[in-house]
């Protein structure tokens, strides 16, 4: 008997005995898994991709994989703010990592875990869920203060441990960041993600008096690219695959697009700079990223094991997301912060017992801004009227259902992108545009915005973007 049928049977019995249905229905638990900087170059999306993610695939087999899931903003703070508050950047005014005006709203601002707490849940968490606070140590207290009954802070890339030579262990010096940003710890137990998952495992092994909202924020594969040595054995440097990087790729890109690509140009330029001394420096960086992403996947596996062992899987909603993607040398970028596909396309999976069909796939473009209202509906909680997103439950029930809500991405005020099943349309604050045909150009090498034969396509996408942005 499925979890949904059990709840229906229990409800019927309670009604016959005179107990209200609301009291009879068992609220589902929520396992909320965040991953930092995980792009789409994984086996979750294509078995031929180099980054091995068997546990993401294991999770997708239980529910619905959104093959076109996108962040609202390709930056840690604004993306997480959108997810955790339900407000997109046009509402929150959180466009960049340095923007924190949203917290000035005070009591009127109700975060996602806080909303669950207000409706009878216990909310606990660990790791990186909100963006880091002052000094980069721990989640922003303005987000955590009212959100959790208990929270174990994210305290950095790893616990205190030995410092290894960055060049010898994977990358040449990049400014003053060599040893701290491009090597890895020798022992898994020194990884902060180990602590995060261990906390979640302990919570899942406990007896609960209330339904639980449990969040686990996995920091990898965010810089620094640490992973246990045994993980690197799966990614030998001689087999490291680089993304395609045609020369002069940015020649047809507007100035603002180039500037966004080079937001942290020191990373890309220093990798190239060191090539005469180490021709494989870019390969080493990509190798380190791949190993870090693989390690993050293994942490997801441990979370699923703990949930299964707890016996609560049939009554637990699971949502997994990455805050944004990541460039690995493509588009002259080794970070995020652009409006191109690789910086915005992310793993996004929802498992909702009794609602999602195991192994289902939804190809509709959607954004993570929809997580807040979706979890409320799945949990039977009243909707929050001022959410900017929309519940994905219709797509969870039927992945081919009509979905009229456009997938909009923003990077900085006035710079927006619209993704459809075929097109990525970008418009910057100065009016300059880009258009890419993903049916024929998945790496976005040819900007079609200046091609008159695509005038009708651009006009239609421009109108959709105008309507979507004007609503905020």
Question: Where do the language-model regions lie?
Answer:
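Bacterial N-terminal signal peptides that target proteins for export
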Residues: 1-10
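Glycine-centered signal
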Residues: 2, 22-23
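Formylglycine-dependent sulfatase
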Residues: 10, 15, 23-428, 432-433, ...
């Amino acid at each position: 008997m499925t979890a949904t049928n059990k709840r229906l049977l229990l409800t019927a019995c309670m009604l016959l005995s005179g107990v209200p249905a609301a009291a009879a229905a068992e609220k589902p638990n929520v396992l909320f898994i965040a991953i930092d900087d995980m792009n789409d170059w994984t086996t979750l999306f294509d078995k031929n991709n180099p980054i091995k993610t068997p546990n993401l695939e294991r999770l997708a087999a239980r529910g619905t994989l959104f093959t076109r899931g996108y962040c609202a903003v390709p930056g840690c703070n604004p993306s997480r703010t959108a997810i955790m508050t339900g407000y997109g950047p046009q509402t929150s005014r959180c466009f960049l990592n340095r923007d924190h005006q949203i917290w000035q709203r005070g009591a009127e601002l109700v975060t996602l875990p806080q909303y669950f707490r207000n409706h009878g849940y216990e909310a606990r968490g660990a790791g990186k869920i909100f963006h880091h606070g002052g000094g980069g140590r721990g989640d922003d207290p303005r987000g955590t203060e009212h959100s959790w009954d208990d929270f174990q802070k994210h305290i950095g890339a790893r616990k205190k441990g030995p410092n290894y030579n960055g060049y010898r262990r994977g990358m040449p010096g990049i400014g003053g960041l060599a040893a701290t940003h491009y090597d890895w710890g020798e022992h898994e137990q020194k990884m902060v993600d180990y602590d995060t998952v261990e906390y979640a495992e302990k919570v899942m092994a406990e007896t609960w008096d209330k339904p639980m909202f449990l969040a686990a924020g996995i920091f990898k594969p965010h810089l620094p690219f640490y992973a246990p040595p045994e993980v690197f054995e799966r990614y030998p440097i001689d087999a490291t695959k680089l993304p395609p990087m045609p020369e002069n790729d940015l020649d047809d890109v507007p100035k603002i697009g180039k500037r966004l690509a080079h937001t942290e140009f020191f990373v890309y330029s220093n990798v190239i700079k060191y090539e005469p001394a180490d021709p494989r420096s870019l390969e080493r960086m990509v190798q380190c990223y791949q190993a870090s992403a693989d390690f993050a996947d293994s942490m997801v596996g441990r979370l699923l094991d703990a949930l299964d062992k707890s016996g609560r899987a049939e009554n637990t909603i699971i949502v997994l997301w990455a805050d944004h993607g990541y460039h690995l040398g493509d588009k002259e970028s080794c970070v995020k912060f652009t409006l191109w596909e690789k910086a915005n396309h992310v793993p996004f999976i929802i498992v909702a017992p009794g609602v999602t069909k195991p192994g289902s796939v939804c190809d509709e473009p959607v954004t993570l801004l929809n997580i807040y209202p979706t979890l409320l509906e799945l949990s039977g909680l009243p909707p929050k009227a001022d959410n900017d997103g929309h519940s994905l439950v219709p797509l969870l029930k039927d992945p081919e259902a009509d979905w009229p809500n456009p997938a909009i991405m923003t990077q900085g005020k006035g710079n927006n992108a619209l993704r459809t099943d075929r097109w990525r349309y970008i418009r910057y604050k100065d009016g300059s545009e880009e258009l890419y045909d993903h049916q024929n150009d998945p790496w976005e090498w040819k900007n079609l915005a200046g091609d008159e034969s695509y005038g009708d396509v651009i006009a239609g996408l421009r109108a959709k973007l105008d309507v979507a942005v004007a609503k905020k």
